[in-house]
Each structure stands twice: as structure tokens, then as C-alpha cells.
Design a protein with these regions (language model features):
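Feature responds to low-complexity, polar/acidic, surface-exposed segments characteristic
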Residues: 2-39, 47-100, 106-127, 133-142
Length: 142
């Protein structure tokens, strides 16, 4: 169990540096991952639809990711689709991440901050990512 958790945490941490909100195809057209140390894995994740990129066709693998981007990644990796009926006060229905945050809330691995806010555009910290991953594994094994 410990090895599985550690492996999964390492994979998720690797993905942390490569997440963005708009879909792109894995192809030769993505210049910003050519020669990147994780190029092969990034292409595999794009082919599987787990990893997506920006509207300009870039992946930006060395950028930080937001809380909204991270929960979207978790939802895709773990196949979470059920939607909560209760949205956070700071998440507009028109935003690309609205449904993803509803999925995360329905799954029970996020609670947000006080005053019913999620802060979707804040960069996720490693501590927050580890807490989310631990909660998801708890839900999966429970």
C-alpha cells in the first residue's frame, strides 16, 4: 500500500508541473515540450486525454498549476464524474473549471476555505496537493 501511494504521489507531483486548462493534441506542433525531460510521458498523457494545454497550443510544463487545474487532473485520473449541487461562492458557473470543482466537491476530497470559497485561480501548494491525494486514496480504498 505504501509503495502504491508513494508511486501515485510522485506521478501526481510530476503532473503538477504540466497541467493547463484547454485541450490540445499530442503532436509535433507542441514546441514547448520538445526536449523536455518528461516529453514522452507528457505526450502519453495528452493522447489519453489526461493532460491538456493552453489555447495557444502550449503545455508550459515548467509552470505552476492552479487549484482548479489540479482538481481537474485528479478528476480525470480517478474517473470522477458525479456533480455536487452546491458550488463555492467564488466559482462562477461560466468558468471552464466550474463542473470540475463540482465533481471534486461531490467526491468529498475538497472542502475549500472558510466562507464557502475555493480560490480556484490560486496556485496549489505541495501541501494542498498531498492532502487532496491522500483524501482521494482514502475514498478509493474505503
Amino acid at each position: 500500500m505504501y509503495k502504491r501511494l508513494l508511486s501515485s504521489v510522485l506521478i501526481i507531483m510530476l503532473l503538477l508541473s504540466a497541467w493547463s486548462p484547454i485541450s490540445v493534441q499530442a503532436s509535433d506542433g507542441i514546441n514547448d515540450i520538445r526536449g523536455h525531460w518528461a516529453e514522452e510521458d507528457l505526450n502519453k498523457w495528452m493522447e489519453k486525454g489526461i493532460l491538456v494545454g493552453y489555447q495557444d497550443g502550449t503545455i508550459r510544463p515548467d509552470n505552476n498549476i492552479t487549484r482548479a487545474e489540479f482538481v481537474t487532473l485528479i478528476n480525470k485520473v480517478f474517473g470522477l464524474y458525479e456533480l455536487s449541487r452546491e458550488q463555492f461562492a467564488d466559482v462562477e458557473d461560466s468558468k471552464w473549471y466550474s463542473r470540475e470543482i463540482l465533481k471534486a466537491r461531490a467526491a468529498g476530497y475538497i472542502a475549500g476555505y472558510g466562507s464557502n470559497v475555493f480560490k480556484p485561480d490560486n496556485y496549489i501548494t505541495r501541501q494542498e496537493a498531498v492532502v487532496i491525494i491522500a483524501k482521494v486514496f482514502e475514498l478509493q480504498s474505503g
